[in-house]
Amino acid sequence: MSRYRITTLALVSLLLPTAWPSAQAGRGTQQRPAAAAPALRPPARADILRGEYGKHRANNDLLYYQLDIRIDPDQRFISGKNTVRFRMLEDDTRIQLDLYANLNVDRITLGERELTYEREINAVFIDFPETLRKGREYSIDFYYSGTPQEKGRFGGIAFRKDPNGKHWINTACEGEGSSIWWPSKDQWRDEPAGMRLSVAIPNDLVDVSNGKFVGKTDLGDGYTRWDWLVQYPINSYNVSLNIGDYVHFGDRSGDLPLDFYVLPGSLEKAQKQFAQAKPMIEIYEDIFGEYPFAKDGYKLIEVPYSGMEHQSAVTYGNRFANGYLERDWTGVGISPKFDFIIIHESAREWFGNAVSAADVSDMWIQEGWTTYLEALYVERRFGPEDALKYINAYKSKVGNRQPVITQRGIHRTPTQDMYFKGALFLHTLRSVVNDDEKWWRVIRDFYQRFKYQNIMTEDMIRFFNAELKQDLTPIFDQYLRRADLPTLELAFDAEGGPLAYRWRADERAFAMPIRVGGPEKWEILRPTTDWQLTKAPMPKDSFEVATDLYYVNVVKQ
């Protein structure tokens, strides 16, 4: 998406008197003020217990989960245990795990010894009779049972029937949390290095979960146990069940197995629609590197909701049609060229599952990057012109009423701007870099540097500042920590004199170069938050700003 004939605009810096803007007020119309941001409700105790990485979470490091459960679909009942292996980072006698209050804690054991615990809302504080020592590894068995509640957009865990009346059970709990259906360390910062899932269900059903399928065992009581092995770090909300009357077909992308699971009546449609997965994976591998969960494979699984990015087990409910739920998602004719759910949810394998946010407040690292990856897919698949149309269409979806990054330590999903403003910020940053070869290298290196890690925005800022050898912190902060967009103020002289210009931004140090002039000869203007003058006159009528390459407001006076 590069522009041509880019030069640096000659200018002279001049700190203008504060009266300058009002003296020019008659030359244009000021931007309409944005609507006031809605007041945020005070965090509930449950939000803090879920979101805070407090003492009894921070004192240990997850190593491994072994989740062994049994599901009775008729009774909507789940029972089993999670074996949790962890290493202590500090001496202590208590750790925190999580399980929704409506589910029973049957018992928690360390070896043969039953442990005491205290429940507060959905938190479970587990006490040990002796001090757990820093550096040592421990393993506990957490037995539980109950009827999970359905909650949230996709149910958290939902018990449904398919069109043929057979049981169809699916989990999708990014917002609600893994503890809605299984005991876990239900937060974003700490992930086990891997896990094993064993799911016992009636013989006529199939379970598709995360990781590599390692076998099934007939238990002799009308139930079959399905075993899956996850060989990479995984966030607890990504752990998933997909239980139903599934049929399977497959493909390969090089050495990577592509496994597809759908209901029998969907097979013919899926064989056609799911063909989009292979070129999508090839495009993302070309940009960022190998598919991050190669040993576990890639799965695409039909579900009764729109879709979710479950690691190595991406779920799909987009009606086997291009666009999003048979709509032109961006309204500019590009979305109908591809299946939005396949492209978006699979992109989360790279950003969200491999590179993960360490706190829900930084969720834009997952959703903003993934939305930007949609545009990169369009660029590689359909060309730069379509990519520009596609990403600029996201501007209409941004509210700019609250910051993208929210308060840390509170489990509160940020504004939906994290998707669209996050993507448009990255699109803008590419134009700031103004060197596509460098941009492709930096984003690939960023991904490779933080693959299989949980990070915060500060980690990204430090990386980009070091790689690009400039301080981009004020630009990051204006777009992500402030609600308002930066506004480029242009004050033209009525008598044909020099142009006065500056950024109006909340970040005092905000200084972002931007392309101006016109398509025949774009030039780089370097505004700061102080007024400056160009050396040469600038005609108002023919003066353009490359707003398709930057997400900014422009006010001409």
Predicted features, each with a name:
Residues 104-110, 208, 472-473, 488, ...:
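Beta-strand-rich binding/interaction modules
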Residues 23-79, 162-168, 473-474:
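N-terminal, polar/Ser/Thr-rich
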Residues 90, 292, 415-499:
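Amphipathic alpha-helical substructures
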Residues 33, 100-161, 221-222, 532-538:
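A surface-exposed beta-strand-loop module
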Residues 81-102, 183-187, 192-202, 458, ...:
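Surface-exposed beta-strand/loop patches in extracellular or lumenal glycoproteins
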Residues 80, 171-174, 185-343:
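Hydrophobic helix-coil surface modules that form long, contiguous segments used
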